[in-house]
């Protein structure tokens, strides 16, 4: 059992970490003023014998400080929703019956519609459920702040509509030629490299665990280290062989391409 815990720990250590969303590096979001604003909404309604309060906070960009966040939310949250119930007859503090948070650990996409900027989060964990959230930003040039005009939480789908400056595109003079064209996160090549290393480590760990199942932790560690050394020592030769075969085939291909029927 202890060795299994060690295996799981090592696997988790190589999982890629995800930073907060930097909107200036997203080819869609960088064209909008979304990095300068957050939006919040608090609505209370009578639900006799109780009073229910629903709060929403939306701040997808790390560039904008989360100074105005609600209690109970985290500053790393892109979206935070809280539903509280107050029972005055019991003279108790309100208690939370619903709470959900979306961070950049969730899958994120940003798209442009004809008159709206759309942010979609999928894979948001809420207990044992997976929730999706759609946020639509509409431009209001007459407003200085974003306003949540609609929020619906039905089953496992959240829909939020925001009107304000965040939905307005920047002027061409505000856009820089050096803006990063790639979407937020790492490039596909970097992710490919990360996952190659990840699955290699998993393979080595599982193989060592299988070979030393009846042994001690020291046996497992020794076997893993030896296998890792052997793998990384032979890796350069393997890469050179692959490169030489690829480059070696190029002249032949060029030579074949040089002949033509007369």
From Swiss-Prot:
Transmembrane intervals: 186-206
Biological source species: Vanderwaltozyma polyspora (strain ATCC 22028 / DSM 70294 / BCRC 21397 / CBS 2163 / NBRC 10782 / NRRL Y-8283 / UCD 57-17)
Residue intervals of the MRH domain: 21-170
Protein name: Autophagy-related protein 27
The UniProt record lists the keyword Transcription regulation: no
GO MF, one example: phosphatidylinositol-3-phosphate binding
Name of the coding gene: ATG27
Family to which the UniProt record says this protein belongs: Belongs to the ATG27 family.
Keywords tagged on the record: Autophagy, Cytoplasmic vesicle, Disulfide bond, Golgi apparatus, Membrane, Mitochondrion, Protein transport, Signal, Transmembrane, Transmembrane helix, Transport
GO cellular component, one term: mitochondrial membrane
Job description of the protein: Regulates the cytoplasm to vacuole transport (Cvt) vesicle formation.
């Amino acid at each position: 059992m202890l060795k299994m815990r060690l295996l799981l720990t090592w696997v988790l250590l190589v999982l890629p970490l995800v930073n907060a969303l930097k909107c200036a590096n997203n080819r869609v979001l960088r064209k909008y003023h979304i990095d300068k604003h957050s939006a919040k909404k608090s609505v209370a309604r009578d639900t006799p014998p109780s009073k229910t309060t629903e709060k929403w906070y939306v701040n997808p960009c790390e560039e904008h400080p989360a100074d105005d966040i609600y209690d109970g939310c985290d500053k790393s949250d892109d979206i935070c929703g809280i539903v509280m119930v107050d029972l005055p007859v019991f003279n108790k503090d309100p208690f939370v019956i619903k709470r959900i948070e979306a961070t950049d650990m969730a899958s994120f996409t940003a798209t442009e519609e004809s008159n709206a900027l759309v942010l979609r989060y999928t894979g948001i964990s809420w207990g044992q459920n997976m929730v999706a959230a759609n946020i639509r930003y509409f431009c209001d040039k007459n407003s200085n702040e974003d306003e949540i005009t609609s929020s619906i939480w039905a089953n496992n789908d959240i829909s939020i509509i925001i009107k304000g400056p965040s939905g307005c595109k920047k002027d061409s003079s505000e856009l820089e030629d050096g803006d990063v064209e790639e979407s937020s996160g790492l490039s596909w090549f970097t992710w490919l490299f990360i996952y190659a290393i990840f699955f290699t480590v998993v393979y080595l760990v599982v193989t060592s665990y299988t070979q030393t199942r009846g042994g001690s932790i020291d046996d497992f560690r020794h076997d893993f280290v030896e296998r890792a050394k052997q793998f990384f020592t032979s890796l350069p030769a393997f890469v050179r062989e692959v490169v030489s075969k690829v480059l070696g085939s190029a002249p032949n291909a060029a030579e074949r391409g040089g002949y033509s029927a007369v």
